[in-house]
Amino acid sequence: PLMRMAAQAAAHMAAGMLDDEDLALEDTSIVLLAGAGDNGGDGLFAAAALAQEGANVTAIAVGRSLHEAGFASFVRAGGKVLVLDPAADIPGCASGFSAGEAGERLQTAIAVARKSHLIIDAMTGIGIQGSLRGIPAALASALGLDGEAPDEPALPNRESSGDFPLVLAVD
């Protein structure tokens, strides 16, 4: 129940952010940066709700797995998944690809995220210790983030920016 409530709140916030920009969900491209833990599960359930409302949602899996129930809900809602880790074990998704293909997938993920209207960051939660490492760090750095754990939770200021992509952190 707690995860579903967090996901509903995140989906509501995301829809509100897009509405503030005069964008209908069915006209938007949303990227979810999804980690393997419960924070990633929150993001997957939120992304599933947005996909059910007509948004074009792509989840970028930054780890070797995804929250099982969140992943199932997201796929049922029509969400697409891009796996970055060659050692990933995510049902129905490619794995075991070469280092060269992993680099190409990372570049694709960066391009897709940069072209989106909204990025939902659910890579890690409040339990992270230290800075991001590996694929999450590379992705965060490429998207203009510093890769360090935030001093406080990131919450949108609800002011219209006109700049895309907007970012919503699921903490």
What is the predicted function of each stretch?
Residues 1-33:
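An N-terminal, well-structured beta->alpha segment
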